[in-house]
């Protein structure tokens, strides 16, 4: 685990974005942890979040021309990541996002920001069922751009309804790499360093054993 990944876990814990306990997911599964990126909700949170996303992008080595944030959660993520890449990595890249409903006045169209072209890096909070990615792919393909990759904050590394995860389905269906700031494996590595969190470690390991990919 890299220093920025450990820092991201601590940031998420401090903001109660990441919690350990017993939680029932939408799928009906009982999970020993819960991650709610919507609680990154202040100016400072967003500034820090952008730096973690930018760090993960640079670390990945994936080449791309533009950041795309799917509405709605992806919009602030794309914006703050673009700022962080420019400020901390000297990479001044365009970004854009979609509207849920197209406008018929003003700028018009369903996109806001830069023209959607070239190699697109899609940024979002998490992938649950992959629906937002599929909707975004329709937009990207309609503009004759290509999907360079997808970056999310957390990869739960667990099976969907079939034998593979929603993330693996996206990689298979679109031939792109999905990267994340942290994974379930990183969470386990972090818990292993914290003797006072041993009870959570056992529960998360058991969950991975049952649902992991």
From Swiss-Prot:
Its EC number is 2.4.2.10. SUPFAM superfamilies: PRTase-like. It comes from the Bacteria. Orotate binds at residues 34-35, 128, 156. Its cofactor is Mg(2+). It catalyses: orotidine 5'-phosphate + diphosphate = orotate + 5-phospho-alpha-D-ribose 1-diphosphate. GO terms for cellular component: cytoplasm. One of its GO terms (molecular function) is orotate phosphoribosyltransferase activity. GO terms for biological process: 'de novo' pyrimidine nucleobase biosynthetic process; 'de novo' UMP biosynthetic process; pyrimidine ribonucleoside biosynthetic process. Keywords: Glycosyltransferase, Magnesium, Pyrimidine biosynthesis, Transferase. InterPro entries: OPRT (IPR023031), Or_phspho_trans_dom (IPR004467), PRibTrfase_dom (IPR000836), PRTase-like (IPR029057). Pfam families: Pribosyltran. Gene3D superfamilies: 3.40.50.2020. Signal peptide: none annotated. 5-phospho-alpha-D-ribose 1-diphosphate binds at residues 26, 72-73, 99-100, 103, 105, 124-132. Homodimer. Belongs to the purine/pyrimidine phosphoribosyltransferase family. PyrE subfamily. Catalyzes the transfer of a ribosyl phosphate group from 5-phosphoribose 1-diphosphate to orotate, leading to the formation of orotidine monophosphate (OMP). This is Orotate phosphoribosyltransferase. It comes from Salmonella typhi.
């Amino acid at each position: 685990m890299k220093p920025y990944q450990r820092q991201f876990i601590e940031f998420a814990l401090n903001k109660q974005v990441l919690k350990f306990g017993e939680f029932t997911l939408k799928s009906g599964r009982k999970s020993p942890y819960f991650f709610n990126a919507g609680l990154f909700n202040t100016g400072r949170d967003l500034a820090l979040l952008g730096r973690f996303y930018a760090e993960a992008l640079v670390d990945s080595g994936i080449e791309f021309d533009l950041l795309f944030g799917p509405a709605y959660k992806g919009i602030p993520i794309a914006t703050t990541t673009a700022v962080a890449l420019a400020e901390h990595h000297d990479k001044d890249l365009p970004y854009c996002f979609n509207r849920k409903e197209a406008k018929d006045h003003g700028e018009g169209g369903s996109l806001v920001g830069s023209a959607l072209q070239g190699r697109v890096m899609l940024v979002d909070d998490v992938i649950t069922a992959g629906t937002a990615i599929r909707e975004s792919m329709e937009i990207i393909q309609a503009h004759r751009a290509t999907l360079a990759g997808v970056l999310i904050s957390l990869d739960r590394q667990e099976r969907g309804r079939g034998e593979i995860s929603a993330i693996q389905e996206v990689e298979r269906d679109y031939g792109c790499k999905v990267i994340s700031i942290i994974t379930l494996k990183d969470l386990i590595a972090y818990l292993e360093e914290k003797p006072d969190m041993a009870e959570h470690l056992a529960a998360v390991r058991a969950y991975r054993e049952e649902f992991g990919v």
